[in-house]
């Protein structure tokens, strides 16, 4: 069975870590720390010069993880991400060129949206799993609640502004598949090589989300 974006988000739930890798020598240890905390899906953003090299190294050394490329803002980046071994692609917005490049690459694609018009555009391109970006706390929670009526069957991954304090408020929404988060692997802990703390942050997020599944 071919991998779909819906399958990626289901596996990522509750949190898809959004990684900014500045030092490629730390990439594998970072991925291992997150995996030790129960994380099995990672998004490596293409915001740094060695991001694709880091992604390729993770794919080679950590085959149990599902690893995608994020912050794709140019059409050519989709094929570059695929060549590096990315298993899915994420962008902060959605354009005709990006949608066409995603289709050509064959990668499962999570386009970013913020408004009803952008959701409709993504739907025209056939995408039903969408990234809500930027997600800014209470305002985005209200927006997602309002989206539930007209956009039946659409699943969102809110990203940007999600924290442990509002994580459950997002995950309780029936149209939220998972959330994207940078707080699990903050740059200061990565630079400090504080792998145990990163593992703990990942485990705490999973435990917090697990409370939703507990009987009342």
What are these regions (language model features)?
Residues 30, 74-84, 117-125, 162-178:
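Catalytic cores of alpha/beta
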Residues 1-87, 104, 153, 164, ...:
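Conserved N-terminal beta1-alpha1 strand-loop-helix module at the mouth
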Residues 20-24, 69-75, 91-95, 111-116, ...:
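Glycine-rich beta-to-alpha transition loops that act as phosphate-gripper elements at the mouths
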Residues 27, 55-59, 123, 144, ...:
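Distinct, well-ordered alpha-helical segments
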Residues 116-130, 140-150:
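Anionic-ligand binding region
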Residues 78, 82-122:
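Hydrophobic, well-structured mid-protein blocks that either form specific transmembrane helices
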Residues 88, 92-98, 131-141, 175-197:
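Glycine-rich phosphate-binding active-site loops on the catalytic face of alpha/beta enzymes
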Residues 65-69, 87-93, 108-113, 128-134, ...:
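Short hydrophobic/aromatic-enriched beta-strand-loop microsegments
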